[in-house]
């Protein structure tokens, strides 16, 4: 873990910090973790905290402590009609940060209880997280996607590169 977090460029590392940040299209929240990953939240309520954490050593099982910065989207327990939107940039370079505006790098195609569909404009990758059987609108690759399916595809030259999986572990309860 890391003991600091950047909130819109400002480094925070005071133990006991607790902040609630509302995010919107016009006022997105930008967070950077200690590993250089950036999180852009443009819909939702973001909570940030820096606390001392107690745990056990992985091998010795002796008590250990450390300072950890955490952030999460607070959407409540089983929200009705809840909504949030965020994007993660994995360790972007300085050039990428200067060249691209985060909100212009992706487009949400669908975001509802049936499916989340997002187009990564920079790479041309289309991604789907399907929760219920659905017929994607305005898609020339799929006419139907079954529930519990994750799909990503990218057109390369005259080929279609695709990754498909089910997040269901099929473990009987």
What function would you assign to each model-found segment?
Residues 2, 11-12, 42-47, 59, ...:
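Context-gated lysine
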